[in-house]
Each structure stands twice: as C-alpha cells, then as structure tokens.
UniProtKB/Swiss-Prot annotation:
Residues 1-250 are annotated as: Nuclear localization. This is Kinetochore protein NDC80 homolog. Residues 1-445 are annotated as: Interaction with the N-terminus of CDCA1. Residues 18-33, 63-74 have a biased composition (Polar residues). It comes from Macaca fascicularis. Residues 446-642 are annotated as: Interaction with the C-terminus of CDCA1 and the SPBC24-SPBC25 subcomplex. The lineage of its organism: Eukaryota, Metazoa, Chordata, Craniata, Vertebrata. It is found in: Nucleus; Chromosome, Centromere, Kinetochore. Phosphorylation begins in S phase of the cell cycle and peaks in mitosis. Phosphorylated by NEK2. Also phosphorylated by AURKA and AURKB. Residues 128-251 are annotated as: Interaction with RB1.
Amino acid sequence: MKRSSVSTGGAGRLSMQELRSQDVNKQGLYTPQTKERPTFGKLSINKPTSERKVSLFGKRTSGHGSRNSQLGIFSSSEKIKDPRPLNDKAFIQQCIRQLCEFLTENGYAHNVSMKSLQAPSVKDFLKIFTFLYGFLCPSYELPDTKFEEEVPRIFKDLGYPFALSKSSMYTVGAPHTWPHIVAALVWLIDCIKIHTAMKESSPLFDDGQPWGEETEDGIMHNKLFLDYTIKCYESFMSGADSFDEMNAELQSKLKDLFNVDAFKLESLEAKNRALNEQIARLEQEREKEPNRLESLRKLKASLQGDVQKYQAYMSNLESHSAILDQKLNGLNEEIARVELECETIKQENTRLQNIIDNQKYSVADIERINHERNELQQTINKLTKDLEAEQQKLWNEELKYARGKEAIETQLAEYHKLARKLKLIPKGAENSKGYDFEIKFNPEAGANCLVKYRAQVYVPLKELLNETEEEINKARNKKMGLEDTLEQLNAMITESKRSVRTLKEEVQKLDDLYQQKIKEAEEEDEKCASELESLEKHKHLLESTVNQGLSEAMNELDAVQREYQLVVQTTTEERRKVGNNLQRLLEMVATHVGSVEKHLEEQIAKADREYEECMSEDLSENIKEIRDKYEKKAALIKSSGE
C-alpha cells in the first residue's frame, strides 16, 4: 500500500543557504492571554483572565537557539501574495462545494447547503469554524467575545500563510470577504485531512529497514537520506554553511548499500560523456539550422499536396480511360454493323447482276425502257420538289403551332402556379370561394377552346381583386394606426429610460454621499482615538513626574529631618496643590472624554437624520431595496461603534 507524502506548510526548507532569521519571540503551545480593549468614557474593569485551551498546531520554538551566519538574513515578515484565483467564481464555487461536502459527510449538526454557503452570517461562520477546529482540538470552545481576534490568531498559529483581518470577521458574507474566508476554511479542511492521515498511517520505517514504500508521486522513503538531512539541518542551525563531511559519509554509505563497482562507474561516466557530446553535437546542429523542423514540415506539406494532385490526376486518367473504353466498344459495334450491311449489299448486287445476266430484252426495248425511265425520273423529281416545298410549309406551320402551344402552356403553367400560391385552385381551396379557376387546355377542341374560360375565370377573379384591394386598404389603415401607436410606445419607452437613468444617477449620488459620510465618521473615530491616546500618554507622563517629585521629596525628608518642623507647613501646602492639580487634570480628562462621546453621538444622529431625509423620497422599488440595505449597514456600523 502506498503512503501519501505530506508536506507541511512552514517546516519545510527550500534552500540550504537561506532563511537565516529566527523568531525568538514565537509562542509555545499555549495561546496568549486575552487583552483588555479600552472603552470610551468608562472606567476599565479588570476581568479575570482564564487560560485558553492548548493548540495542537501552535508556533514552534527553535531548539538550538539563535543562529549566526555570514550569508545574510531574510525577514519572515514579507507579505506573501495569494496565488489562488479568489476572483474566479468557478474556483469559489468549487471551494464552497468542498466545504459543504465535508460538513455533510462528517455529521455537521446544522442544516447546510450550497445556497446557504453563498453568503453566510457571522453566527453560521463561527459554528462552522468551531466544528472544523474541533477535529484538531476536540476540547476547544470559541469564546463569547473577541472572536474577531481569536479566529485570525488560530489560523496564524496553524501556519496559514495569508493574513485574515479583524474587520473581515464582521462582514463574513460580503462579496469581497467571503472568498478569502472560504479559501481559508478549505485550507483548514486540508489540514484536518492531513492530520487524520498522519494519525492513521503507519511508521515510515521499521527497525533495520533503510528503504520505505513508494509514495503516490514516485518518491522512495529513504531512512539513510532522512538521517543525512537531519544531520545537515542540525549542523546548519548550529552555524555551519558547508556539509562536505556529511556528503562524504553519505556517499560511502550509499556505495556500501548499493554495492557500487568502480569499474562500472567509470564505464557509466564514459557513456555519460559520450551522451553529453552527442547532445552538444545535436544542440550545435539545431543552432546551425534552427528552422529545420519548420522546413521539414513545409516540405511534408508540399509533398502531401503533390500526392493529392497526383491522386486527382490518376483519378482523371482512370475516368478518361473508362470513357475511351466505352467509345472503343461503341466503335467495335459500329464496325460489326457496317460489315454486316456491306455483306448484305454485296449479296443484293450479286442477285441483281444475276437478274441482269438472265434477262431477254432487245436493244430497242432497252432504249424505250430507258426513255420511259428518264421521263418517269423527271416526273418523280418534279413531284419530289413539290413534296419538299409542301413538307417545308407543313414544317413551318407545325413549328409555329408548337411555339404557340408552348407559349400558351407556359402562360397556363405560370397562371396555375400563381393560382396555387394564392390558394385559388383546386376548387375547394381557401380563397376560391367555390369557383373553379383551373383552365384546361385542349388544342384538339379547336381555336375556341379557351373562350368559355373568360366568363368562368375573369368575372370571379375581378370580384376577388376588388375584395382584396379593400382588405389591403383596411390593413394599410390598421398598419398606419399601429405605427402611430408604436411611435407613442417608443416615446414612452424613451421617457422611461430617461427617468430610469435619472433615478440611477440619483441613487449613485446617494451612494457616494453615504460612502462619504461613512468615511467622515471613520476619520472622526480615528481622530478621537488618537486624541484619547495622547491624553493617556499625557496622564502617564504626569503620574511619572509626580512619582519622581514625591521620591525626591521623601529623600529630602530623610536628609533634613531636623528641619521637618520648619518646612512641614510648606510640604503640606505643596502636597495639597499637587492633589488639586491631579484632580483637576482627571476632571478635564473625564470632561473631554464625555464631550468626545457626545460629539460622536451627535455625528451618528446627524448621519442617521441625513440618511432618513435622503431615503424619504419615493423614487422606485429598487431605491427602497437599496435603502433597506443601507439601513442594515448603518445599524451594523452603529452597533460596532457602540
């Protein structure tokens, strides 16, 4: 079974000669005590401090003390940039899904879903955080107060590399805060999984076993290398910057462990040199001809184009060859037919020659027959010419008749096409109204075969045209009315858009005014806090001055006890003056603090009054929703200020 390799967040070291700084003020396993937060205008009451629970992943302290090195110091307070895509909605949804699945699988007591985790409240976040941290510290209980300091401190103690601000704890579900917090919760879930896997996993090495099992990433757990790393780290923390002795010891142990042969090493080194030379030679060839691959690709593309052209040419040749074969077959058939006709003609000539040889006529009979044949031939020629002329006339008439018939059929086809398109034919069509608008052309019926269709088609068609024109006029009037209505609607829409734009501008102005008021209130708070701090410093300075004067007076009193009776009245008067000054100073401080509180209350009331005046205008439903949101934010600011 493979053992998963675990990389801790802050214990691993990337380089052997960096990370020289060591925090000697790091805390141990116990978390620090809670500190009092000063309040305005009230006496601070000391609350009994209670020791918190032990943290499993507290900040570790170095076991070798501070370390001196000549290679420089790197500050550990550099702010690390978060590489995670926290602005990516898909990544945030994936983190929310992981959090929801982990809570559901591990028996979270409250109902939780993807929708409820899109923008949870502070109360829900504290419940989820307490449930998750309970896996690492089962006896942990979140305090009722100052959770905004407790939660970031716990993440910092666990080694979370990115800082969580206190202000983000008040607005957990805000769009600019929730991505950072849900990413931190997913990191905490990963810590829980690692902690669980470490508790359930077996030791890496048994006694006498220098090699462990292979992990998922293919790394072998080597006890010898781990011992070497521990020794080097201890030497490094004690101030050493070179580890030649450890390297030599590790090399000898590895040779003994793997039974290394020196001759094999030499042969491997020779092979390595040969391979390096080959690599260098190939690199030089690549530098000499950097675009060789591109040229080969172009050559390959051109050759592929030539292959395609040759294939097309071969297909054309094959088709041409098939055509020639067909022509050759036709010519062979024609030759066979002509040979057969030639043979038939030869037989007929032979028969006629036999008849001529066997006939019994005289020369006069032959001349008379020839003369009659010539006359008959002339008559035949004349009749043939007359027949050709009549046939030419007949052909012209037939051609004229065919053209006229074709024109009539074309017009009828166009008429039938338009009639079908207008739904006039067949007789039961939608727009036929019971009339038969189909024209049947029968040339054999004579020249008047189309006359009867004039009364059958023209009159109903004229009526339909009149009705259609009336409907077109009505539709045109209706269209004009609709266009007028559309223009009015467009004008109304334009006016509405202008009103919406005006309302948006007013909302933006109100939002800017609200942000300005919040900024002014924050600046006023900071100013009051700085004034209070300066007053506290002045008070401490006065107390130290008074204490110093009192000690000097006591020393002088010890030195001049003999003159006590003479100066007792003067000393009493000075003490009374000092007491009066202190009392007056305390009264001034209390009065100033009260005036600061009163000024803050007046500013808050003024901001609320201006806010209510701004929100009293009835703009639209959207502005009402924005007003509700602003009221919630103002209440939250007021509660945090109190």
